[in-house]
């Protein structure tokens, strides 16, 4: 079994309307969403993002201008709002100091710098690089690991799982599914895992349909 085969299985199961998948791909909003989505559902993140938009503060300067209590209230739907307030403030202060603005951050940030920021783990780092900065970075989330484990793949680290997934044949898949870049492929691949997981995995329980599909595939 190869990463290519798994990609095609998921691609044929999920009707992915947009290869880039993440809402407002390539924008500053993705950075905020990647932090807010830690340990919560995306619909909760959308409520928080809407609060920030309605307040007119969905920017580095806007968020940094807020006191902690105000920001915590605005992002309350995402849960862990006091912790996430500190994480956002720390990250955006560092971005402002090191890069000045989002566009420079998008063009210049590297993985080592980003993952060294407090509260930014491997998954959040990959999500920001892939969906905000448009880099060739594959995101590995819990759904991905659960599916790979079901297929009897065990990985000792995030990087090891990421490397296996990145074994896709871009030339073949780009011709077959019209991917214009490796980033576009990685965006879609992660999106497929998430959408499949949302539909077929509850906790650690797979739907019978998913079990049959993956067992036959494996």
Regions found by a protein language model. Give the residues of each.
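Catalytic cores of DNA base-excision repair glycosylases
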Residues: 3-218
């Amino acid at each position: 079994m190869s990463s290519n085969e798994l990609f095609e299985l998921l691609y044929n199961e999920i009707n992915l309307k947009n290869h880039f998948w993440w809402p407002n791909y390539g924008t500053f909003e993705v950075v905020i969403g990647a932090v807010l989505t830690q340990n919560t559902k995306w619909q909760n993140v959308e409520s928080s993002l809407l609060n920030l938009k309605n307040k007119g503060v969905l920017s580095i300067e806007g968020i940094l201008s807020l006191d902690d209590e105000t920001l915590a209230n605005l992002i309350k739907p995402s849960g862990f709002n006091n912790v996430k307030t500190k994480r956002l403030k720390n990250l955006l202060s560092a971005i402002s100091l090191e890069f000045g603005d989002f566009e420079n951050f998008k063009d210049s940030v590297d993985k080592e710098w980003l993952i060294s920021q407090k509260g930014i783990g491997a998954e959040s780092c990959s999500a920001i690089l892939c969906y905000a900065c448009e880099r060739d970075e594959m995101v590995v989330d819990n759904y991905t690991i659960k599916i790979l484990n079901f297929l009897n793949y065990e990985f000792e680290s995030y990087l090891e799982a990421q490397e296996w997934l990145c074994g896709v044949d871009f030339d073949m898949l780009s011709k077959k599914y019209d991917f214009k870049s490796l980033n576009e492929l990685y965006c879609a691949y992660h999106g497929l895992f998430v959408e499949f997981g949302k539909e077929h995995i509850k906790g650690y329980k797979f739907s019978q349909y998913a079990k049959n599909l993956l067992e036959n595939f494996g």
